[in-house]
Curated annotation (Swiss-Prot):
This is Photosystem II reaction center protein M. PSII is composed of 1 copy each of membrane proteins PsbA, PsbB, PsbC, PsbD, PsbE, PsbF, PsbH, PsbI, PsbJ, PsbK, PsbL, PsbM, PsbT, PsbX, PsbY, PsbZ, Psb30/Ycf12, at least 3 peripheral proteins of the oxygen-evolving complex and a large number of cofactors. It forms dimeric complexes. It comes from the Eukaryota. One of the components of the core complex of photosystem II (PSII). PSII is a light-driven water:plastoquinone oxidoreductase that uses light energy to abstract electrons from H(2)O, generating O(2) and a proton gradient subsequently used for ATP formation. It consists of a core antenna complex that captures photons, and an electron transfer chain that converts photonic excitation into a charge separation. This subunit is found at the monomer-monomer interface. It is found in: Plastid, Chloroplast thylakoid membrane. It comes from Phaseolus vulgaris. The chain crosses the membrane at residues 5-25. One of its GO terms (cellular component) is chloroplast thylakoid membrane. Keywords: Chloroplast, Membrane, Photosynthesis, Photosystem II, Plastid, Reaction center, Thylakoid, Transmembrane, Transmembrane helix. Belongs to the PsbM family. Its main location: plastid. Disulfide bonds: none annotated.
């Protein structure tokens, strides 16, 4: 079974982008409330 590089990258981006977005919002919220 070959690993589809494009599919792997797409999946990684699909997971990492929303995670990074939420992390940035979380950091901004914490720094604001501090």
């Amino acid at each position: 079974m070959e690993v589809n590089i494009l599919a792997f990258i797409a999946t990684a981006l699909f997971i990492l982008v929303p995670t990074a977005f939420l992390l940035i919002i979380y950091v901004k919220t914490v720094s604001k409330s501090d």
